[in-house]
Amino acid sequence: MIEVDRIVSANAKVDDEYIDRAIRPKLLSDYIGQPQVREQMEIFIQAAKLRQDALDHLLIFGPPGLGKTTLANIVANEMGVNIRTTSGPVLEKAGDLAAMLTNLEPHDVLFIDEIHRLSPAIEEVLYPAMEDYQLDIMIGEGPAARSIKLDLPPFTLIGATTRAGSLTSPLRDRFGIVQRLEFYSVEDLASIVTRSAVCLQLEIDVEAGQEIACRSRGTPRIANRLLRRVRDYADVKNGGKITALIAQEALKMLDVDLAGFDFMDRKLLQAIIERFDGGPVGLDNLAAAIGEERDTIEDVLEPYLIQQGFLQRTPRGRIATSRTYRHFGLEQIEK
C-alpha cells in the first residue's frame, strides 16, 4: 500500500519512533495544543493524587499521529508511576494479559495501543480487572477445571484507538475518562516544530517553522517528520540553518505543497477535475483512472481530503469542491 512510503502519512514509521521518543514532552506543562484535554487531565490527575487513588481508566481516541501515546506517557509521568506498554494485536492469549496485570504496582499505568483490536477472550479478562481490580483465572482442564480470583492492585488502563466506534459497548463503558484528540492548528504545529528543533539542537527561523507547520496536515507526527527531512536539506545546502527559503526549497523537493498534498493527493483530485469534469465519479472508475486500489482511495487518500473540504462523497460518487478548483487555480465548471 502506498501509505507506507508517503512522507505525509500519519501512520508511524520505524524511523519515527527513535526521534519521537527523544522529542516527546514528558509533562502536561510541555504539552502543546489540545487545550481542553490538557485542562481536564490536569484536574483529573491532581484530584487522583490528592486522594492517593489510581487515575480512572482513560480512553484516548482520534486520527493517527496526534499524540495518543505521548499523552499516555505524560499521564504516567504526572502520576509518578510506571507505565507498561502493549498493543491489541500483541495480546493473543489471556495469559499474556494476566502476566502484565499481575506485575503491576499500585497505581501503575497499563497502556494498550490499538485497543479496538483486542480479541473477545482478552476483553473478558479485562472486564473484572477494570471494574473490580480482580483477575479470574481458570486452573486445570476439563471437568477438573476451576476458577480462582486474584486481587490486583489499583491500576489505570489507558486505551488508545483510531476507531472508537469499533470498541464493544461493555469495554467502552468501563472507561471513566474519554478524551478525543483533534487535528492541530497551524499555530500549535509551528510551536511543536520550534520545540522539536530545540530538542534536536537545530537552528530554525520562525517563518521556517510556519512553512513546515502549514504543510503538516494538522498532525504533529508529520510535522516532526518534515522537520527532519528539511534538516537534511539544510545540512547540505545551508550549513544546517533552516530559513524560510530553505524550508520552501526542501518541501518543494519533497513534493509537498501548501495544503500538505503530495503527488497522490493531487493525482486523485486532478483526475476528478480533468477526466470526470469535477464529478460525480464512482469509486471503481476513479480507481481505474489513477491506477490505485479502491481500499487505498477510501482508507488512505480520501479521509484528509474530505476532512479539509476538498472532496465530497455523495450517493452518485465523488465530487471535487470549489476549494479544490481554487487550490489548483482553476475555474469551476458550471453545471
From Swiss-Prot:
Region (Large ATPase domain (RuvB-L)): 4-184
Subcellular localization: Cytoplasm
Major place of residence: cytoplasm
Catalytic activity, EC: 3.6.4.-
Binding site for ATP: 23-24, 65, 68-70, 131-133, 174, 184, 221
CDD domains per the UniProt record, alphabetical: AAA
GO biological process, alphabetically ordered: DNA recombination; DNA repair
Residue positions binding DNA: 294, 313, 318
Signal peptide region: none
Chain residues that bind Mg(2+): 69
UniProt xrefs under Gene3D superfamilies: 1.10.8.60, P-loop containing nucleotide triphosphate hydrolases (3.40.50.300), Winged helix-like DNA-binding domain superfamily/Winged helix DNA-binding domain (1.10.10.10)
Alphabetically ordered keywords of this record: ATP-binding, Cytoplasm, DNA damage, DNA recombination, DNA repair, DNA-binding, Hydrolase, Nucleotide-binding
InterPro entries: AAA+_ATPase, AAA_lid_4, DNA_helicase_Holl-junc_RuvB, P-loop_NTPase, RuvB-like_N, RuvB_C, WH-like_DNA-bd_sf, WH_DNA-bd_sf
Known catalytic reactions: ATP + H2O = ADP + phosphate + H(+)
Region (Small ATPAse domain (RuvB-S)): 185-255
Domain text: Has 3 domains, the large (RuvB-L) and small ATPase (RuvB-S) domains and the C-terminal head (RuvB-H) domain. The head domain binds DNA, while the ATPase domains jointly bind ATP, ADP or are empty depending on the state of the subunit in the translocation cycle. During a single DNA translocation step the structure of each domain remains the same, but their relative positions change.
Oligomer status and interactors: Homohexamer. Forms an RuvA(8)-RuvB(12)-Holliday junction (HJ) complex. HJ DNA is sandwiched between 2 RuvA tetramers; dsDNA enters through RuvA and exits via RuvB. An RuvB hexamer assembles on each DNA strand where it exits the tetramer. Each RuvB hexamer is contacted by two RuvA subunits (via domain III) on 2 adjacent RuvB subunits; this complex drives branch migration. In the full resolvosome a probable DNA-RuvA(4)-RuvB(12)-RuvC(2) complex forms which resolves the HJ.
Role noted for this protein: The RuvA-RuvB-RuvC complex processes Holliday junction (HJ) DNA during genetic recombination and DNA repair, while the RuvA-RuvB complex plays an important role in the rescue of blocked DNA replication forks via replication fork reversal (RFR). RuvA specifically binds to HJ cruciform DNA, conferring on it an open structure. The RuvB hexamer acts as an ATP-dependent pump, pulling dsDNA into and through the RuvAB complex. RuvB forms 2 homohexamers on either side of HJ DNA bound by 1 or 2 RuvA tetramers; 4 subunits per hexamer contact DNA at a time.
Protein name as catalogued: Holliday junction branch migration complex subunit RuvB
Taxonomic path: Bacteria, Pseudomonadati, Pseudomonadota, Gammaproteobacteria, Pasteurellales
